[in-house]
């Protein structure tokens, strides 16, 4: 699915202290599409942007309560409206994350629709994070990973998390049992040939020590 070039950027600028609160009131003030989101070129499926902050030692319930829904996009036009109105990854404070998930599923390991899946996880240089995030977003909503997954699987999300030295990107899939048939990493390397990824691995959600059988953190 070919995607058009983004329209002129209309990004919000962060506060001087670079704190990105984006509470529910502020989310409502973003220049996002008005419901219903039906006009424009439809995506193959809806996708939801999420924002959260992950802190060591938080409980699963606290992790879920920190999660903020930004918007569910149904068209290419509404995707760009959201993307162009949220801060760049490079402007997010430490330990904040963006997620884009298929449908309205939450970026939580034990969410019923996620629990049997896992993630390809990799570290990226900070100067490359914004580009990597954008390219993976476009590949995801454009269903470019479809031919690189098992027929019994699909990519269901992508995340970027701001960390101390290098940032972390994750690509979520729905069925860890068939990951051996996937060529998702090869597609990522093809999309981003000049990016030096580090510590690249795949891990099923159920193998995380914090997997709690019904509630989770990422």
Swiss-Prot record:
Disulfide bonds: none annotated. GO terms for cellular component: eukaryotic translation initiation factor 4F complex. The keyword Protein biosynthesis applies. It comes from the Eukaryota. One of its GO terms (molecular function) is RNA 7-methylguanosine cap binding. Keywords: Initiation factor, Protein biosynthesis, RNA-binding, Translation regulation. One of its GO terms (biological process) is regulation of translation. It holds the Pfam family IF4E. Residues 1-23 are annotated as: Disordered. Residues 8-23 have a biased composition (Basic and acidic residues). MRNA binds at residues 109-110, 163-168. Belongs to the eukaryotic initiation factor 4E family. PANTHER family: EUKARYOTIC TRANSLATION INITIATION FACTOR 4E RELATED (PTHR11960), EUKARYOTIC TRANSLATION INITIATION FACTOR 4E TYPE 3 (PTHR11960:SF66). Recognizes and binds the 7-methylguanosine-containing mRNA cap during an early step in the initiation of protein synthesis. eIF4F is a multi-subunit complex, the composition of which varies with external and internal environmental conditions. It is composed of at least eIF4A, eIF4E and eIF4G. This is Eukaryotic translation initiation factor 4E type 3-B. It comes from Xenopus laevis. The lineage of its organism: Eukaryota, Metazoa, Chordata, Craniata, Vertebrata.
């Amino acid at each position: 699915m070919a995607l058009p070039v983004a329209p002129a950027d209309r990004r919000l600028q962060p506060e001087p202290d670079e704190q990105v609160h984006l509470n529910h009131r502020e989310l409502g003030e973003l220049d996002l599409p008005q419901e219903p989101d039906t006009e424009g070129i439809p995506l193959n499926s809806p996708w939801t942007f999420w924002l959260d902050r992950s802190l060591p030692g938080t409980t699963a319930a606290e992790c879920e309560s920190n999660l903020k829904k930004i918007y569910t996009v149904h068209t290419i036009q509404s995707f760009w409206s959201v993307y162009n109105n949220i801060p760049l990854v490079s402007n997010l404070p430490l330990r904040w994350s963006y997620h884009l998930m298929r449908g309205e599923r939450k970026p939580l390991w034990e969410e019923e629709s996620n629990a049997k899946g896992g993630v390809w996880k990799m570290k990226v240089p900070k100067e490359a994070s914004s580009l990597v995030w954008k390219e993976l977003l476009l590949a995801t909503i454009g269903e470019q990973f479809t031919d690189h997954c098992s027929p019994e699987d699909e990519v269901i999300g992508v995340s970027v998390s701001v960390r101390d030295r290098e940032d972390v990107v994750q690509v979520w899939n729905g069925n860890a049992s068939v990951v051996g048939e996937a060529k998702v990493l090869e597609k990522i390397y093809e999309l981003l040939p000049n990016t030096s990824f580090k510590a690249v691995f795949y891990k099923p959600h159920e193998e995380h020590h914090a997997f709690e059988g019904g509630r989770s953190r990422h």
